[in-house]
Amino acid sequence: MTVETQLNPTPPVNQQIYRILRRDIVHCLIAPGTPLSEKEVSVRFNVSRQPVREAFIKLAENGLIQIRPQRGSYVNKISMAQVRNGSFIRQAIECAVARRAASMITESQCYQLEQNLHQQRIAIERKQLDDFFELDDNFHQLLTQIADCQLAWDTIENLKATVDRVRYMSFDHVSPPEMLLRQHLDIFSALQKRDGDAVERAMTQHLQEISESVRQIRQENSDWFSEE
């Protein structure tokens, strides 16, 4: 039985459906290989099929689902190629962003990062993984704002969907939030010192964590992964 999900009346419906389905796929609430029905999703959100179809197209563009005309849609397995390429591109962008942010950061921006890190700590203490996941993203997005490069975050956001699935799966034991928070604190410390070399090293170490995580996660969930 499909449980209806209420949407906010203000933002575009297709964008809301996309965000909710993306979250469900990234959090593995909808597992790799699961069929997706336009009809069932439209019933879930109590909408016509058109906004659902538009959300499906965007999910496909992000590499999260496969749309096969006349054969239906399904959630893609986690592509090792996309994880490798997405991680490589993200590291190149974010290391450059971090170095630039170190030369531009203001005291008020330091305070913003400090508040974010405090909220991360609270989320960990309360075992609120979904909140930590969002705060982790917000931390990295703040760095692109400090570096005055919104395009960098837009690019990262478009390519990191597959990597996000590995990130979320790693929280349990491979890359626990406590360790990720320590790495965020190292990045913040280097930013406070305006040390471009140190912040780039800290960011590199932080982002390489996904490469270590994916090996173990794949061993434990081999049916969810593909080489393509």
From Swiss-Prot:
Keyword Nuclease: no
Family annotation (InterPro entries): GntR_C, TF_FadR/GntR_C, Tscrpt_reg_HTH_GntR, WH-like_DNA-bd_sf, WH_DNA-bd_sf
Record keywords, A-Z: DNA-binding, Transcription, Transcription regulation
SUPFAM superfamilies documented for this protein: GntR ligand-binding domain-like (SSF48008), Winged helix' DNA-binding domain (SSF46785)
SMART domains, alphabetized: FCD (SM00895), HTH_GNTR (SM00345)
Pfam families: FCD (PF07729), GntR (PF00392)
Keyword DNA-binding recorded: yes
HTH gntR-type domain: residues covered: 11-78
One GO molecular-function entry: DNA binding
Start-end of DNA-binding region: 38-57
Protein name, as recorded: Uncharacterized HTH-type transcriptional regulator YdfH
